[in-house]
Amino acid sequence: KARVGFKAGVKDYRLTYYTPEYENKDTDILAAFRVTPQPGVPAEEAAAAVAAESSTGTWTTVWTDGLTSLDRYKGRCYHIEAVVGEENQYIAYVAYPLDLFEEGSVTNMFTSIVGNVFGFXXXRALRLEDLRIPPAYSKTFQGPPHGIQVERDKLNKYGRPLLGCTIKPKLGLSAKNYGRAVYECLRGGLDFTKDDENVNSQPFMRWRDRFLFCAEALYKAQAETGEIKGHYLNATAGTCEEMIKRAVFARELGVPIVMHDYLTGGFTANTTLAHYCRDNGLLLHIHRAMHAVIDRQKNHGMHFRVLAKALRMSGGDHIHSGTVVGKLEGEREMTLGFVDLLRDDYIEKDRSRGIFFTQDWVSMPGVLPVASGGIHVWHMPALTEIFGDDSVLQFGGGTLGHPWGNAPGAVANRVALEACVQARNEGRDLASEGNEIIREACSW
């Protein structure tokens, strides 16, 4: 009888993939998962299963395991802690060796870490809470096309948040009327106007017509106000080739910024566009359409801070990041946590703000967070205080809903912003005096 060189059959994941004695390396990618095991499954087994299925493991021992070094390539669950106040929920920390990932590919990183494991039978629910991206990996990415400082220099705007506005109604306007709305907003004092995320190239308004009329509006408003203006021209399309075609046309028109829906468009398309934008001097505005499908559930999916980190690596100069005060959900501390992850170079671990790992971006350019969704002029003091100068505040209905029209709505927002920034610089407290500051500004 031939002797078999390995022991076939199913064995517990924790025997191989749960290694509490492991000391993680500086080059490891670290992940924090919120694991809810099925009833009767021990936490160690569920956590080890997550590490296995998102790296080298499969459900049984295979003879080809002998042809490689599992110790070198396997993901390891190195720590488990129970979640306070939740029954049968754990945070599992997993370390992945750098060799498991293709350089410069967010697509590959996500395919590995969250690709397969979320449908796994042993886990009842699973959520990726945070990732630590080591410098050895982040240095393989270009990151944002330009970053915060270069954007301010391009626009010649300093010392205050930037103001934007999404053109509404988002669908149904003709290109000429759309351009007219853009012009009115920019003339009134906004820095940017924005295509809605679902404005691509529909029968009522084809992309080329929209680009032309918006460019005309832009230049007319610039000539009148003496300020540099921008309109986020949405280049998102059905294919990468078509997307780049639209970005090329935007560049030929000489406009400063284009836009992409990075989750529906996909990370491969987004990284492609980010590279084009850096090579051609375009700023890139990123919308997070579809994020709530992934990040809304508290115990399953992925936290937005992970999607935000991925975007900084893939590339974007602005990204929508919730408002803390408007119509869309977002807790203040958590939101500020990932806003810092977008803007700052070095962020300390701080569990109260949802930051599980210290993250060093080693001088990768920062991304401007965009506050957008149900905010209006009375929120301005709170927004100025919460987000600070390096942000874009976007008022859609809060501009266009003004009873006198778009331009007066834009004027109202600009006046409120300037008043809040001036009051803050004079040492007044925006939290307590905010409404008073806005009322004073009304009488200018």
From Swiss-Prot:
<dbReference type="Pfam" id="PF00016">
    <property type="entry name" value="RuBisCO_large"/>
</dbReference>
<keyword id="KW-1015">Disulfide bond</keyword>
<keyword id="KW-0120">Carbon dioxide fixation</keyword>
<comment type="similarity">
    <text>Belongs to the RuBisCO large chain family. Type I subfamily.</text>
</comment>
<feature type="modified residue" description="N6-carboxylysine">
    <location>
        <position position="194"/>
    </location>
</feature>
<dbReference type="InterPro" id="IPR036422">
    <property type="entry name" value="RuBisCO_lsu_N_sf"/>
</dbReference>
<keyword id="KW-0602">Photosynthesis</keyword>
<dbReference type="GO" id="GO:0004497">
    <property type="term" value="F:monooxygenase activity"/>
</dbReference>
<dbReference type="GO" id="GO:0016984">
    <property type="term" value="F:ribulose-bisphosphate carboxylase activity"/>
</dbReference>
<keyword id="KW-0488">Methylation</keyword>
<keyword id="KW-0601">Photorespiration</keyword>
<comment type="subunit">
    <text>Heterohexadecamer of 8 large chains and 8 small chains; disulfide-linked. The disulfide link is formed within the large subunit homodimers.</text>
</comment>
<keyword id="KW-0460">Magnesium</keyword>
<feature type="site" description="Transition state stabilizer">
    <location>
        <position position="327"/>
    </location>
</feature>
<dbReference type="GO" id="GO:0009507">
    <property type="term" value="C:chloroplast"/>
</dbReference>
<feature type="binding site">
    <location>
        <position position="197"/>
    </location>
    <ligand>
        <name>Mg(2+)</name>
    </ligand>
</feature>
<dbReference type="InterPro" id="IPR020878">
    <property type="entry name" value="RuBisCo_large_chain_AS"/>
</dbReference>
<feature type="binding site">
    <location>
        <position position="320"/>
    </location>
    <ligand>
        <name>substrate</name>
    </ligand>
</feature>
<keyword id="KW-0150">Chloroplast</keyword>
<feature type="modified residue" description="N6,N6,N6-trimethyllysine">
    <location>
        <position position="7"/>
    </location>
</feature>
<dbReference type="InterPro" id="IPR020888">
    <property type="entry name" value="RuBisCO_lsuI"/>
</dbReference>
<feature type="binding site">
    <location>
        <position position="196"/>
    </location>
    <ligand>
        <name>Mg(2+)</name>
    </ligand>
</feature>
<feature type="binding site" description="via carbamate group">
    <location>
        <position position="194"/>
    </location>
    <ligand>
        <name>Mg(2+)</name>
    </ligand>
</feature>
<dbReference type="Pfam" id="PF02788">
    <property type="entry name" value="RuBisCO_large_N"/>
</dbReference>
<feature type="active site" description="Proton acceptor">
    <location>
        <position position="168"/>
    </location>
</feature>
<keyword id="KW-0560">Oxidoreductase</keyword>
<dbReference type="InterPro" id="IPR036376">
    <property type="entry name" value="RuBisCO_lsu_C_sf"/>
</dbReference>
<feature type="binding site">
    <location>
        <position position="170"/>
    </location>
    <ligand>
        <name>substrate</name>
    </ligand>
</feature>
<dbReference type="InterPro" id="IPR000685">
    <property type="entry name" value="RuBisCO_lsu_C"/>
</dbReference>
<feature type="binding site">
    <location>
        <position position="166"/>
    </location>
    <ligand>
        <name>substrate</name>
    </ligand>
</feature>
<keyword id="KW-0934">Plastid</keyword>
<feature type="active site" description="Proton acceptor">
    <location>
        <position position="287"/>
    </location>
</feature>
<protein>
    <recommendedName>
        <fullName>Ribulose bisphosphate carboxylase large chain</fullName>
        <ecNumber>4.1.1.39</ecNumber>
    </recommendedName>
</protein>
<dbReference type="InterPro" id="IPR017443">
    <property type="entry name" value="RuBisCO_lsu_fd_N"/>
</dbReference>
<keyword id="KW-0479">Metal-binding</keyword>
<dbReference type="GO" id="GO:0019253">
    <property type="term" value="P:reductive pentose-phosphate cycle"/>
</dbReference>
<feature type="binding site">
    <location>
        <position position="372"/>
    </location>
    <ligand>
        <name>substrate</name>
    </ligand>
</feature>
<keyword id="KW-0503">Monooxygenase</keyword>
<dbReference type="GO" id="GO:0009853">
    <property type="term" value="P:photorespiration"/>
</dbReference>
<dbReference type="InterPro" id="IPR033966">
    <property type="entry name" value="RuBisCO"/>
</dbReference>
<dbReference type="GO" id="GO:0000287">
    <property type="term" value="F:magnesium ion binding"/>
</dbReference>
<keyword id="KW-0456">Lyase</keyword>
